């Protein structure tokens, strides 16, 4: 935190340390006197972002550039970081350039907004002006994208995936999943939501096979699913495919797009070359990718195109179940919505089931039929989307829903004000006691 300040001789080391402790305290970091003694791997993602805010503010700059500081954070962590950033900007008088693809977040932080597209300014104005009366079609699309929601479908009678009393751990002393029971019907979507560390991705690892459960049973399409990946048949492996959060890590940079998509066709079905070419062309059409991308490499594609390639490759195996692990978290809203629309259309045409993992409750509203809310390795709320997202709520689900940024300027200010009022009330109560 103090490295740049001391390096540029803006403060003495002792002064910089004192300033860092002040900022740690102000930004709500735990044990501020000793927080600076920790290493980055010893703190959470939200604490790291607040520490980086302290680093940026340490030398009292005139301008701080925030480049997507909350994109990878879950909603409850995100709101704490946003509150810290907003307070820091207001208290220090520092100007801020806040870069984000999430308009709901921008609505809480910014005074003015500039909308960019393809390197050019589309529109600029005050927050109220952009949200209440956007002039350009692109801006209107950005504002409207979070307002879409689909109705839950009537629950199908046939189960594809049944998870019964599953527990799992990475070592005997650290249980990660405890007594998970869920059911996913054929052709439907079960969304798994929760904070980082709640066990969402671990559950996906258990279903897909790399992590064996310590207790419980999983049934897939009517038969018991072997816990070990090595014991699963080739047919079972084909029927359970995954779309990862980071397509750059999932795609081989040395293979062309045609090679990447055709690989499952050769591996699972032994298709000859001509048949593979025809099947790849059909998958390209299904995922709405330009045909001229087939001979290109992943580095030559946009983020949305890479994710579509991942979807095409997964669909090449003709699976019954797709595990979607945060597939849109790194994409801007319009690209993310296009991916979600693609997944909805593919599901309608192929009747593929989705286990959809996300921390974004706005996405859940647009994709899910059923929802399971996870907290500290357990399911705390589970059912049809309408039931889970309607009151009465358990405390944790209420916290998650209350932390989703709203497309309403001033929403975060209201939360800060309520917290301050609650703090004052608690202080007065303690003094009377």
Residue ranges and their predicted role:
Residues 121-125, 133, 379-383:
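ABC ATPase "signature
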Residues 38-43, 47, 297-301, 305:
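Conserved ABC ATPase signature
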Residues 60, 318:
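Conserved catalytic motifs of ABC-family nucleotide-binding domains
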């Amino acid at each position: 935190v103090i490295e740049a300040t001391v390096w540029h001789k803006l403060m003495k080391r002792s002064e910089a340390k004192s300033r860092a402790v002040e900022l740690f305290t102000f930004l709500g970091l735990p044990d501020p006197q000793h927080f600076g003694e920790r290493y980055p791997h010893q703190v959470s993602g939200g604490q790291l972002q607040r520490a980086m805010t302290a680093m940026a503010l340490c030398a009292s700059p005139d301008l701080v550039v925030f480049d997507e500081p909350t994109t990878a954070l879950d909603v409850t962590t995100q709101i704490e970081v946003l509150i810290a950033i907003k307070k820091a900007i207001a208290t220090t008088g520092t100007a801020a350039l806040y870069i984000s693809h999430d308009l709901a977040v921008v609505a809480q932080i910014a005074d003015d907004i500039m909308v960019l597209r393809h390197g050019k300014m589309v529109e600029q104005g005050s927050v109220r002006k952009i949200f209440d009366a956007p002039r350009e079609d692109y801006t209107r699309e950005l504002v409207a994208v979070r307002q879409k929601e689909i109705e839950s479908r009537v629950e199908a009678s046939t189960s594809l995936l049944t998870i019964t009393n599953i527990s799992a751990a990475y070592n005997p002393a650290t249980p990660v999943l405890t007594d998970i029971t869920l059911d996913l019907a054929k052709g439907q979507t079960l969304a798994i939501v929760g904070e980082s560390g709640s066990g969402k991705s671990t559950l996906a690892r258990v279903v897909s096979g790399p992590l064996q459960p310590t207790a419980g049973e999983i049934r897939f399409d009517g038969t018991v699913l072997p816990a070990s990946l090595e014991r699963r048949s080739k047919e079972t492996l084909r029927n359970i495919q995954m779309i990862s959060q980071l397509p750059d890590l999932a795609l081989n940079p040395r293979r062309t797009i045609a090679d990447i998509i055709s690989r499952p066709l050769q591996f699972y079905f032994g298709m000859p070359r001509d048949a593979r070419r025809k099947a790849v062309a059909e998958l390209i059409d299904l995922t709405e990718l330009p045909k001229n991308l087939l001979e290109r490499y992943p580095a030559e594609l946009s983020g949305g195109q890479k994710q579509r390639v991942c979807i095409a490759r997964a669909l090449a195996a003709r699976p019954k179940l797709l595990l979607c692990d945060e597939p849109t978290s790194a994409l801007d809203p319009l690209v993310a919505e296009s991916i979600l629309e693609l997944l909805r259309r593919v599901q309608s045409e192929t009747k593929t089931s989705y286990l959809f993992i996300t921390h974004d409750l706005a996405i859940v509203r647009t994709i899910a039929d059923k929802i399971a809310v996870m907290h500290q390795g357990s399911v705390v709320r589970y059912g049809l989307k309408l039931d889970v997202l309607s009151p009465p709520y358990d405390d944790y689900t209420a916290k998650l829903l209350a932390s989703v940024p709203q497309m309403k300027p001033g929403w975060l200010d209201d939360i800060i004000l309520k917290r301050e009022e609650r703090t004052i009330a608690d202080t007065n109560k303690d003094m009377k006691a």
